[in-house]
Amino acid sequence: MARPLTHPHIDEVTVAGILHALSDPVRLGIVSKLLKAPAGMNGRETTLKLKLAMPKSTCSQHYRILREAGLIVSERRGVDLTSRVRAAELDTRFPGLLASILKSYKKEASRPAR
C-alpha cells in the first residue's frame, strides 16, 4: 500500500519554504507548467510536457519538495499522481509572492543565453 501524501496546512507554509522549493529551476518550471495546465493533469504528463529527461525517482523528489513546502497539493489516482498549485491559498497568505516569482522566472527564461 502506498504511503499517504502529507500536505502542510496553509498556516504552516512559510516564505522561506517557498523560496527554498522554488530555488531549483526544474521545480520552478514544474510550478509554472502546472499553473498553465488543464485541471487534473498528472505529474507524468507535466514531466512529458516539460520534456524533462530525468528518472521517475528524481521527478518524484521534486514533487515531494514542492508538496512539503505547501506549493502544491497532490492526489494519487491509481499509479499516477495528480497535482495542482495552491495558487489562491498562497496568494491569500502571501499576496503577490508567487506571481512575482513566476514573473521574474519568465523574464529570465526569455533572455538569450550568455
PLM features: residue spans?
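Amphipathic alpha-helical dimerization/coiled-coil segments
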Residues: 2-14, 32-37, 82-114
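N-proximal short alpha-helices
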Residues: 3-4, 32, 39, 63, ...
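Generic macromolecular interface patches on structured domains
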Residues: 40-41, 69, 100
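Canonical helix-turn-helix DNA-binding module
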Residues: 44-72
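Short C-terminal domain-edge/linker segments immediately following a structured domain
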Residues: 61-64, 73-76, 103-106, 112-114
